[in-house]
Curated annotation (Swiss-Prot):
GO BP annotation list: protein refolding
Residues holding ATP: 29-32, 50, 86-90, 416, 497
Keyword Nucleotide-binding attributed: yes
Gene name of this polypeptide: groEL
Principal EC category: isomerase
Listed GO MF terms: ATP binding; ATP-dependent protein folding chaperone; isomerase activity; unfolded protein binding
Subcellular location(s) per record: Cytoplasm
Pfam families named in the record: Cpn60_TCP1
Native source species: Neorickettsia sennetsu
Family: Belongs to the chaperonin (HSP60) family.
The protein's name in its UniProt record: Chaperonin GroEL
Quaternary organization: Forms a cylinder of 14 subunits composed of two heptameric rings stacked back-to-back. Interacts with the co-chaperonin GroES.
Amino acid sequence: MANEVISGEQLQRVIRDAADLVVSSAGVTLGPEGRPVIMSKSYGGPEVTKDGYKVMNQLKPEDEKVAKIVELLNQATSQANEKAGDGTTTATILVGNMIKNAHKHIAAQRSRMKLKSGMKRARDEVVKYIQSVAKKINSEEEIAQVGSISANGNSEIGGKIAEAMNKVGKEGVITVEEGKGLDEFSVSVVQGMVFDRGYVSPYFITNPEKMIVEFDNPYVLLANKKLSSIQPMVPLLETIVRSNRAVVIIAEDVEGEALTSLVLSKMRGSLKACAVKAPGFGDRRSEMLEDIRILTGAKTLVSDDLGVTVESLTVEDLGTAKSIIISKDSTTIVDGGGEKTAIEARVKQIKTQIDKTTSDYDKEKLQERLAKLAGGVAVLKVGGATEVEVKERKDRVEDALHATRAAVEEGIVPGGGATLLSAIAVLEKLSSDDDDEQAGINIVKTALKAPISQIVENAGEDASVITYNLLESKDPNRIFDARELKYVDAFKAGIIDPAKVVRVALESAVSVASVLVTTEALIVDLPTKDNGSSSMMPGGGMGGMGGF
């Protein structure tokens, strides 16, 4: 396939166009007076949202060159969302402003590497500042307050999040599920586990918006070996298909023909499945698979040592769970189908091993297993009158939970873009003997005004006046309330941000902006001429895969 290479001023113009597009599209949603965006969907009616992250992911520019840069800019929002669960729109506005300012310096023939160096020096100083002004939160009451603020003042949501954290610990596993009742909003602790392994292939994803796999009442197939052939699994998988249930395969690895066949079957809609690599290595992997077997109630697992093959399994041998959630980095098993007495016996066995071992390393790993197996999972159940209302409430609770976790982890800072604005004073003291590096510092310094300016503009006020007044006050806790249109104390008014969200938004923005500042060329494929033929996914059954 032929391609096109662009560089120089043409490339800079494409980068500017992409940055302008994402900022103008997502920026309008920022702040309490942010405006909604209507998005057309490939199925169903249009969606109205104030979620900048959703808007960014919906952008599909017709110009292939602009589309590639938009894709790269999306990494800033994805990084912010993955690491902190929020701050995506702030990251977008920051990176857009940095690119806009960097273009002037690139046009003036400044050293791009020195610009990058200055930007990173500025980033490091601002991160130190954010960490220095962050206020730690510890009590259940403070956690409830942060949760309430994160949920736009909903004290019930804040209270339930605090209750859940109190039950399983601040580092414990908390999931949000759809409830059955009209006004249901409850907290319960069930048997469960989370481990640090995600899906083998992103093609298994069932929720593209959150980039996760979600299954209700799935089977769990465990294998302490690599699975590379699909044929031995066909009879079992055909039975699972007829039961209209999903299956999660947790194995040493799933590769080759087995992985390809599972992915294609999932994409065709004939099988709901996901493959996950088993946690740990060697003997430790065997022990963790046994933990999962007991938790899920599986009768056995595939193992050469045990003489158990995939062909010999029936659905009665598989484990079950009320739900399983899988991201690219982790797997959460909620309410496994194992017997409580068997789980308690396993916990007792691990405790005995901890007492007997003399190795600090082994003791640490055993304690990790104990925490995973005995800690349980807190489940927040959210109900509503309609499916739309339940989804909206569930999304709101999940957003508040992410923000609260971030706040518990690194503390809270004044919100509304005020913390980044006050960090300008720190960069005023940061200087470089190299003019080009100083220009890089100034790129970040100028960008720190952008988020609060966008919030103020969305509220219909003059951003230049507001930012000037706040900088002149030299009070880091003084912010502008964009809803009430007045200056207030951030902590007294409850307008705060998790420090982690602000930090990650800045780091993500500088990371992506630095790449674009130093980029010399862009290669895109040229459209191919239509010769009347088309490439299609093969339909019907696949050879050697039975009827699923």
